[in-house]
């Protein structure tokens, strides 16, 4: 293929456009051979082998050298193996039934090499003109038709993942892509010469074949009108029936795909040619960017372009606006001294202590002072003072610089009005360390005075006037406070109860230290009168009840029952109080004596019942 501007000699060895395959790489690789067979692609390689081929054909030059050469030069099909061979076609087959072999592959992978498309097939213009002149003068109408620029665009998406064997007799240096663009504009007259003439016309046109493959390398040349973004892997081949030239291989019927229309009938009107140069440029640029993005193995990240500098306009409203001298008699609303007074103070007097960071007491310094009639403010002694932070830290501040512009919003802004010198704020020399001036009180009953007093209260209610403490100093009570015995749970005093065991009837009925028994412990008391029947006492209750009831003091806490673990421990190891002592025998003897005496008394009572 000879593109315009490519004047390389014909004797330069041409290279194939096919990328390096797995077999040729493994044959030269020093690594150990893989476990897979030699010609079988892996699953990853099958997934990655998807070729997008774009064929751009355009006739860049319409006028050729006059056909005055001799006819002694043989055709490039027989003279040079490195020229683009054109598969011939019999007259019986029309041009629309051209079959494309999508799976054709070179048989010997060891002889593959790589070269960009622009250097693959380079034929000299003189040889092309001589071979064109060999067709005879009877082909002149067809030549005029072929000289018209007729661009063609063919896009074929091929899946080459399947591993089919190539056709037999395939020449290893032949290209796999030929576009019969002009077959529809020719008449099939002679079986031999006309097919040979059509092959020469196709070779004369610059054909741009673009293949996007992961192994392709971008190569460009300065003399090309359309540089290719990557090397070519030929995706398909035009397979036709053989004619006179014996170099055309016989295609395998198993490798043929269904008949597709030609590129000229797809994208070009048959009557009037039309130019596709802008479309070719846009497609080429898009495909170049696509190949550069997706098929670059390791693309170094480039830093982003420097952004243009951003211009920010910040407008801050300062407390003193442009004042006209005609409006200087209007009174001020702000509770701080005027700005001109601060300007005079900054240049004439020593630096005073910095004002607080409150709402209205940081005043701006907007430049050189005007020679005004404002009275100077007495300077405060520069001494270290504690900073007024809300955090409560006690850091000692250094001597503060002169006050700076107050960029915070005023509580009561001036609103562009001046301040009368008669109502200048009066500052005393005994003011605190933080510079604070009290403005003179305006007229009574005015709303300005109320606003002034409200601003004062707002300043004094700042959190800096409060005593701040750390949270860790507060004691967190984890256990509740025990209740006092002389107070009720509500905090009321308890009634004093008598520590008695025997109560009179009056005390009981007057509810003095008496608690009515609950339903669970309804005991009969001594006040019940038993009835005597047949010499026996009958009580109202059916069960045996206790006569004496010990009333405990309710103010005293109840004795808690020992837990089960304490009981078991006490049963195993006796306490010293419960341990047997040496006086147990004497105590038992005394108890037996008392029992004997009691029995004797009962017997005597039975014998003499009248004594009761």
Curated annotation (Swiss-Prot):
Record keywords: Acetylation, Chromosome, Myogenesis, Nucleus, Phosphoprotein
Region listing for Required for nuclear lamina association, in residue ranges: 136-392
GO process annotations (BP): muscle organ development
Region Required for nuclear localization, residue ranges: 546-563
Annotated region described as Disordered, given as residue ranges: 1-48, 65-96, 119-150, 206-256, 323-405, 444-463, 553-583
Main location: nucleus
Domain of life: Eukaryota
Annotated localization: Chromosome; Nucleus; Nucleus lamina; Nucleus, Nucleoplasm
Keyword Metal-binding set for record: no
Gene Ontology CC annotation, any one: chromosome
Keyword Phosphoprotein listed: yes
Positions of modified residues (Phosphoserine): 307
Residue ranges with Pro residues bias: 243-252, 366-379
Annotated protein name in UniProt: Proline-rich protein 14
Taxonomic lineage of the native organism: Eukaryota, Metazoa, Chordata, Craniata, Vertebrata
Gene name linked to the record: Prr14
